[in-house]
Amino acid sequence: MTAGTAVDGARAVLLDTCALIWLANGDALQPQALSAIISAGSADGIFVSPASAWEIGMLSRPRQGRSGAVSFLPDPQSWFARFVAGPGIRIAPLLPEIMIAASFLPEPIHGDPGDRLILATARHHQMPVVTRDRKIIDYASAGHARVIAC
């Protein structure tokens, strides 16, 4: 899929947390996703959900049953702030209606609160989600969202 017309009428994409991390780390992305991100960036239309900040915080803390925390240097808050200060990147507004809509997404949807908020944000602003998350891709294939696989 191509980037959608969204916030302020510009072509825009919403990065899932995994896409945000891979983009920040310079990891390889699918050509279609990279093209959509570059196009959106030229119009200040690369959006990141505040839910991704929460997910990054959760990934960075040690938890039982997990091999180790993910390092975001120098710390998760600075890492996230540095990423969203990049050219073409904006924080997507997390409005009360988006938060409520995340509780009422069309089924079938899994229970991950971060993914639900990201999907509700994308639906509200009519943006595709750039992701490699199989659950989000499957949700989109059911017609409930648009994705660009990365």
How should these model regions be labeled?
Residues 1-48, 64-76, 134:
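Short, well-structured N-terminal submotif of metal-dependent ribonuclease cores
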Residues 60-89, 97:
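Active-site-proximal, substrate-binding regions of enzyme catalytic domains
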Residues 1-8, 119-150:
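Acidic, PIN/NYN-like endoribonuclease modules and their adjacent C-terminal/linker elements
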Residues 45, 88-90, 146:
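Conserved beta-strand segments of alpha/beta enzyme cores
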Residues 19, 52-53, 98, 118, ...:
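Alpha-helix capping/helix-boundary segments
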Residues 56:
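Phosphate/NTP-binding elements of NTP-utilizing enzymes
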Residues 85-132:
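Active-site neighborhoods of divalent-metal-dependent phosphate/nucleic-acid chemistry enzymes
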